[in-house]
From Swiss-Prot:
One of its GO terms (biological process) is sulfate assimilation. Keywords: Amino-acid biosynthesis, Cysteine biosynthesis, Electron transport, FAD, Flavoprotein, FMN, NADP, Oxidoreductase, Transport. It comes from Photobacterium profundum (strain SS9). Pathway: Sulfur metabolism; hydrogen sulfide biosynthesis; hydrogen sulfide from sulfite (NADPH route): step 1/1. It catalyses: hydrogen sulfide + 3 NADP(+) + 3 H2O = sulfite + 3 NADPH + 4 H(+). Residues 70-208 form the Flavodoxin-like domain. FAD binds at T328, G362, R392, L393, Y394, S395, T410, V411, G412, G425, G426, A427, S428, Y605. Alpha(8)-beta(8). The alpha component is a flavoprotein, the beta component is a hemoprotein. InterPro entries: CysJ, CysJ-like_FAD-binding, CysJ_Proteobact, FAD-bd_FR_type, Flavdoxin-like, Flavodoxin/NO_synth, Flavoprot_Pyr_Nucl_cyt_Rdtase, Flavoprotein-like_sf. Its EC number is 1.8.1.2. This is Sulfite reductase [NADPH] flavoprotein alpha-component. NADP(+) binds at S525, R526, K531, V532, Y533, V534, Q535, D567.
Length: 605
């Protein structure tokens, strides 16, 4: 029943409470409504009565004092898993469950033997790797030291991207390890795709229901109840509640003969109170190209004027495609679904081969998938193929110590030709082509605690970032410069040509001249017959790299995950082998120890 109808019917709520709920609903996104639903479900399970106080005062509810404890462990690389874990903790507390929230990096594996109920929330990093904070726990649970866990009930939820081969691999690993140790699953593992908010909220409700079946509760106690988004919005912006910032600058920083269009983006955060650290990312909520939306509906025989239901509202199909759905990048699920709808022999053959399906999906835009076989679809069928729109995360390329209430990005514009037609990336073309300077753009800061400068300013730093992977290192050097850090800085940068692709060249030369950067080594792959990349420069300076490592240097790598990061990793192993006189196995262990101690950090994509 709609909230606006409540006052007209018999209801346990008074008019003031109805007004509060109406306000909360009106100011909340679909994801926030899903969270609120789970939160109020938890309250309904308590034995104590609840009382909603005025929104202008801190709200409290009576919640049952539990007997027994639920431990929530999160393994998070960029913060998404942590966010889900925090929401679950709040819902569990409201439901009267004693709960402990802990990072996988702070959790001792041997403590599993003392637990009765555990929920583990895990993201996956790189190629099926556990997040940095979870490496030790991940290794412990598959080791001979792991205890048998016959008295443990557990649940696992994974966050990932189904476009990648090792989708939610860390969550799958934890699920498998706990099961082999004799623990009993409370419910089936959920593997969430990029649009995880709603399914994760539903799963949390089910998980808490299962936990409460065997976690008893006692007398009521008072716990805080933050009931509206607007109460939190005063001091904090987030993915669900982004800040409406202003685009100050979108400047092309590659030369006229470059095959790339890379933009330096400056965004005004004045008055927002938003803060960030070097290494964090900026989430950008973007809109799709209206022309692309119209082309897609035409491709499947629709006009775009059809009305569809989106979160309880009826809106035109083309409007939904512009603002609510991902319509640029294909994914394996979309290709699989369209293969079934279109009965395309080509797509059916691709679907039968997972590797070819993943390769095709990663290199093909949605409109080109739809063009594989002319197929009439209904508006509902088209929508069923699509993911919900999610924000694009960009590594921040500025330090607030340097730029104040601004945030800078370094954005590579995705643009290529498909036959006689042009194809563009959704977010990059929005920032570079469709958003005018002075226009509003919704943003939020995504913390990345796994890509941070060393706390000790005397520590040497080695930064390896070709192409737009240079972004966080611009922030790092600005930060170290403003802090007058004594530690040495060494930058490896690479791209196609010196003349047209040396991003921020003047700035690096200034830092080199002033002594902020002690060493700058570049690799321009197309300036000579033989291709040279950053990993080659690392090997050329193997002796010095090893010396810096012996001095305690931290190593950072940012950029392409599929090729560059692997090649740099192999180069570092070779340096350790040759200069440290170690076997390959010992070199791998050495590098793994660097990663565990936060001396080897990667921000790859």
């Amino acid at each position: 029943m709609l909230l606006k109808e409540l006052s007209a019917v018999a209801s346990p709520l008074n008019d003031q409470q109805i007004d509060q709920l109406q306000q909360a609903a009106a100011e909340s996104s679909p994801q926030q409504l899903a969270w609120i639903s789970g939160y109020f479900w938890g309250l309904s399970q308590t034995q104590a009565s609840t009382h909603l106080q005025s929104v202008s005062q801190p709200g409290v509810v009576a919640a049952a004092q539990p007997a027994g404890k639920l431990t929530i462990i999160y393994a998070s690389q960029t913060g998404n898993a942590k966010g889900v874990a925090i929401a679950l903790k709040e819902e569990a507390t409201a439901a009267g469950i004693a709960v402990e929230l802990v990072s996988a990096g702070d959790y001792k594996g041997k403590n599993f033997a003392k637990e009765t109920h555990v929920i583990l929330i895990a993201s996956t990093h790189g190629e099926g790797e556990a997040p940095d904070d979870a490496i030790d726990l991940h290794e412990f649970l598959q080791s001979k030291k792991a205890p048998k866990l016959p008295n443990l009930q557990y649940a696992v939820i994974g966050l990932g991207d189904s476009s990648y081969e090792f989708f939610c691999q860390t969550a799958k690993d934890f699920d498998s390890y706990l099961s082999k140790l004799g623990a009993q699953p409370m419910l089936e593992r959920l593997d969430c795709d990029v649009d995880y908010d709603a399914p994760a909220a539903e799963w949390r409700v089910k998980a808490l229901a299962k936990a409460k079946e065997t976690l008893s509760t006692g007398d009521a106690d008072v716990v805080p109840l933050p009931i509206t988004q607007s109460q939190q919005a005063v001091s904090q912006y987030s993915k669900q509640n982004p800040y409406e910032a202003t685009l100050l600058t979108s400047q092309k920083i590659t030369g006229r003969h470059s095959g790339k269009d890379v933009r330096h983006i400056e965004i005004d955060l004045e008055g927002s109170g938003l803060t960030y650290q070097a290494g964090d990312a900026l989430g950008v909520w973007y809109e799709n190209d209206p022309e692309l939306a119209l082309a897609i509906v035409a491709k499947v025989g629709l006009s775009g004027e059809e009305l569809i239901d989106v979160d309880g509202e009826h809106i035109q199909l083309v409007t939904a495609l512009v603002s609510q759905y991902e319509i640029t990048s294909a994914n394996p699920q979309l290709v699989t679904k369209f293969a079934a709808l279109s009965e395309s022999k080509k797509l059916e053959k691709l679907v039968a081969d997972k590797n070819k399906l993943r390769e095709y999906s990663g290199n093909t835009q949605i409109i080109d998938v739809l063009a594989e076989k002319k197929t009439q679809l209904s508006a509902e069928q088209l929508i069923s193929l699509l993911r919900r729109l999610t924000p694009r995360l960009y590594s921040i390329s500025s330090s607030q110590e340097e730029v104040g209430e601004e945030v800078h990005l370094t954005v590579g514009v995705v643009e290529f030709e498909k036959g006689e037609e042009s194809r563009q990336g959704g977010a990059s073309s929005f920032l570079s082509h469709r958003l005018e300077e002075g226009a509003a753009v919704k943003v939020f800061v995504e913390e990345n605690n796994n890509f941070k400068l060393p706390a000790d300013d005397n520590t040497p730093v080695i930064m390896i970032g070709p192409g737009t992977g240079i972004a966080p290192f611009r922030a790092f050097v600005q930060e170290r410069d403003n802090r007058e850090a004594e530690g040495k800085n060494w930058l490896f940068f690479g791209d196609r040509t010196f003349t047209d692709d040396f991003l921020y060249q003047v700035e690096w030369q200034k830092y080199l001249k002033s002594g902020v950067v002690q060493q700058l080594d570049v690799a321009f792959s197309r300036d000579q017959v033989e291709k040279v990349y950053v990993q080659h420069r690392v090997l050329e300076h193997a002796e010095q790299v090893w010396q810096w490592l012996q001095e305690g240097a931290h190593v950072y790598v940012c950029g392409d995950m599929n090729h560059m990061a692997k090649d740099v990793h192999d180069a570092l192993l070779t340096v350790i082998e040759q200069q440290g006189k170690q076997s390959r196995e010992q070199a791998e262990q050495y590098l793994n120890e660097l990663r565990k101690s936060k001396r080897y950090q990667k921000d790859v994509y």
